[in-house]
């Protein structure tokens, strides 16, 4: 069987009210434990912007008000094999930001256990992996310049 990378999106979810920006982070419980932002695979023939809106709704219950694509992508290898990822050795991703209205989050119980709205400095310390930290920095820089 040919092994490959799952085509996916990273979505930095944010809420902006006046000059206050907060980022949504989720506590992962499926495959590994730690904090992250919404992410997920892109379905066959699905446009990436649609995948962004779908993943945010599935993982948080929040409606996306706006989407921004960034010129940042990458890939990483899984540290172990997953039953639900047969034939895949890792994930390739493209970065997006999704603006939402801050509200009560309905986390996907299968994947996450909790959520937090955090300002940038706390959010960047909270997320686990360097590619997620870099993603937050990119989005925060863009938002700070607007």
Language-model segments: which ranges?
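Short aromatic/basic micro-patch
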Residues: 36, 90, 117
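Short, well-ordered beta-strand micro-motif
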Residues: 13-15, 27, 95-99
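Active-site segment of metal-dependent pyrophosphate-handling enzymes
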Residues: 61-104
């Amino acid at each position: 069987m040919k092994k490959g990378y799952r085509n996916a999106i990273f979505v930095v979810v944010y809420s902006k009210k006046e000059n206050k920006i907060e980022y949504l982070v989720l506590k992962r419980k499926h495959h590994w434990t730690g904090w992250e932002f919404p992410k997920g695979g892109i379905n066959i023939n699905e446009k990436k912007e649609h995948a962004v809106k779908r993943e945010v709704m599935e993982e948080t219950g929040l409606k996306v008000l706006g989407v921004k694509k960034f010129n940042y992508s990458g890939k990483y290898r899984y540290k172990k094999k997953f039953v639900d990822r047969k034939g895949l050795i890792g994930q390739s991703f493209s970065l997006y930001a999704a603006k939402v209205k801050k509200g009560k989050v309905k986390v996907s119980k299968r994947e996450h256990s909790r959520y937090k709205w955090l300002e940038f400095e706390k959010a960047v310390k909270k997320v686990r992996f360097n590619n997620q930290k870099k993603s937050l920095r990119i989005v925060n820089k863009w938002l700070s310049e607007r």
